[in-house]
Amino acid sequence: MKLPIYLDYAATTPVDPRVAEKMFQYMTMDGIFGNPASRSHRYGWQAEEAVDIARNQVADLINADHREIVFTSGATESNNLAIKGVAHFYNKKGKHIITSKTEHKAVLDTCRQLEREGFEVTYLEPASNGIIPMERLEAAMRDDTILVSIMHVNNEIGVIHDIDAIGELCRSKGIIFHMDAAQSAGKLPIDVQATKVDLISISGHKMYGPKGIGALYVRRKPRIRLEAQMHGGGHERGMRSGTLPTHQIVGLGEAAAIAKAEMATDNERIGRLRDKLWNGIKHIEETYINGDLTQRFCGSLNVSFNYVEGESLMMALKDLAVSSGSACTSASLEPSYVLRALGLNDEMAHSSIRFSIGRFTTEEEIDHAIETITQSIDKLREMSPLWEMFKDGIDLNQVQWAHH
């Protein structure tokens, strides 16, 4: 067993060896290294064919048409292109956008930028289970609303939104629906023929593909128009200029094909391991799960251990690669804005750990994790005066702390 045990699959996934092997065939002089836009010789044609195959593989994953897939550098760029692209193209129709307070920073900061440009954004509060109630979404809709951007699976707490219902509501009001599927593409079934979603952001490195590659699904019927955010040679039907990185695109395609074929068996095993982990630690006193218990992705577990300081817990769990909050914001000492939006106080938000399980997690690793967590919590609480006061029946909210 390799230490530390990797339980941070929501931050990134290792590249599947089958994907890496395929990618290597598209880099060197011995392989297919040409520019897919070189139309005058075989090197270019072969690269273009590889890109076409990968585009079809990504399209198949979500049951889309290959012409609806635009390659980007990742989900952050896809989110930017979708939200800014729609806002700039449809701004004559309206300047109101709806999103939620628990979105990824790539969505929130893009919306903040649009606010500076004169757009109005409504940030919806989730319920305490982390899910946006449909009535709140409907109540926020106005005649000048042009876009709703709601994530499929939350990156910190793993809750799943009812995208079918959101899609129906948006379509009935003539509002474009963008979904950030960084955490769900390749892990949960998505069918654009069945779900009325107009734009989908996809990330390669969240589904055992390489970092630095992603895609944006852009619906053709009814047709969604975008204003490009990256200008140049007019690649990707004018929506995203820049030479296509063949090896990364091939990697994304292969990862998508593997995910589609193995999703059901992967999820069954991952779900079993997650339940084993939760059943192994839920007996620890004052331990709470964050986010809805049933409407959640099988690989995700966000747990608060009350009366334990999150940072010291992270240090104690040095044999486990886990995170507090998302990787994109965990470097800051601010408590998770996602957990705060659920109504957790600073202390509870600070004492939370995100465990995320994936394709290469083993039973043995979960057993070791349970043991490590249990021992660490016991040890840290032994040293904690707050825990002692709590055990003595003192209500810590009533304590008057001396100010220095």
Curated annotation (Swiss-Prot):
It is found in: Cytoplasm. GO terms for cellular component: L-cysteine desulfurase complex. One of its GO terms (biological process) is [2Fe-2S] cluster assembly. It catalyses: (sulfur carrier)-H + L-cysteine = (sulfur carrier)-SH + L-alanine. The keyword Transport does not apply. [2Fe-2S] cluster binds at C328. Its EC number is 2.8.1.7. Gene3D superfamilies: Aspartate Aminotransferase, domain 1 (3.90.1150.10), Type I PLP-dependent aspartate aminotransferase-like (Major domain) (3.40.640.10). Keywords: 2Fe-2S, Cytoplasm, Iron, Iron-sulfur, Metal-binding, Pyridoxal phosphate, Transferase. Its cofactor is pyridoxal 5'-phosphate. The active site is at C328. Pfam families: Aminotran_5 (PF00266). Homodimer. Forms a heterotetramer with IscU, interacts with other sulfur acceptors. This is Cysteine desulfurase IscS.
